[in-house]
Every structure is written in C-alpha cells, then in structure tokens.
Curated annotation (Swiss-Prot):
It comes from the Viruses. The N-terminal domain is composed of the N-myristoyl glycine and of a cluster of positively charged amino acids. It is required for inner plasma membrane targeting of Nef and virion incorporation, and thereby for infectivity. This domain is also involved in binding to p53. The SH3-binding domain constituted of PxxP motifs mediates binding to several Src family proteins thereby regulating their tyrosine kinase activity. This is Protein Nef. Residues 7-22 are annotated as: Necessary for MHC-I internalization. It is found in: Host cell membrane; Host cytoplasm, Host perinuclear region; Virion; Secreted. The lineage of its organism: Viruses, Riboviria, Pararnavirae, Artverviricota, Revtraviricetes. Residues 2-53 are annotated as: N-terminal. A motif (Di-leucine internalization motif) lies at residues 155-156.
Amino acid sequence: MGNIFGRWPGARKAIEDLHNTSSEPVGQASQDLQNKGGLTTNTLGTSADVLEYSADHTEEEVGFPVRPAVPMRPMTEKLAIDLSWFLKEKGGLDGLFFSPKRAAILDTWMYNTQGVFPDWQNYTPGPGIRYPLCRGWLFKLVPVDPPEDDEKNILLHPACSHGTTDPDGETLIWRFDSSLARRHIARERYPEYFK
C-alpha cells in the first residue's frame, strides 16, 4: 500500500488500536477468495461478472488506461478506512449526490488501481440513512430534500438525473462519518446480512 493514500500516523494508530479484528468480506467472490484462497465453482458467475463489469466500464469515456497492477483481492477494513480518509482529504465524495453510475466509477477505479472486487460498496436498505455493509467504509448515504423544480435546477443540477434511481424515491448524498470506523452500525441493525 505504501504512500498511496498519504500518511496520517496518529489517526491510523488510533483506528488500528480500536480494531484488532479482521473485517469480513461482503460479496460472494470476496468471501471465497478469503476463505478458500481463490474463486470456486460457485463463484464462476461472479468472476465472469467481474470480467464483464470491467470490460463494460473500460470502454466508456470514464475508463482507465491500465489493468489491475496488483492481484485481485477483497476490500479490507484497513483499505476501506484509508480510501475513505483519502477521498475526504481530496474532497471526493462528501456531499455529492449518489447515483449508481458514480458508484460504478468508484468501483471501476478501485478494481483497476487496487485490484479490489467491485462487490464492496453495498448499503443497508432504506428508507432513511443507508449505512455501509463494508466495515471501514466511512461514507453513509443520507436522504436530502430534492432541489426546487425551477428551470436552472432542471438543466444543471445532478440530482435531477441521478436521484430518481432509488427504489424508495429518495435523493441521497454521500456523507463522511468517522464514527463508522469505531462502530459497525449496519451489523448492529441488520445482523441477518452477516450470517
């Protein structure tokens, strides 16, 4: 990992002291990779989906010029925390309207630069605040009031084209919440997802 996300030794040490347990992978491919050391026959569809996902997203305008420089791996708690703080410091996601396309861009970037399976960015169901299922990911989805329907917002505001894809009809934004590093709220509220 090195200096990819920068150094913040005090915060990192405090977080590591709080979490001496390893995180559990969320997706089936990540679970098989951690438990069995590779993809098994029951995840062949998943690995094909990963390859198809990568092929679909590298041909778009948002594509990336390189294939993964590291072996494929599941998202770990440390990597998720480092990525969250990196995106917060660089002004990445905090306050942006959530859309599946933006989430796919982030998944594709992580797949191509870090070799992380694109199954890590999942959230609890709505309505209301959606908490990340991946331990260490410090961005939750918070519902906001949709902007006013004046001509300027219809033409320019990203919520008009991205906020309508939520099954509950809510407009969601990413919010950074450092308390998610200390407490896994998704596991507390939805233990059935972690059996």
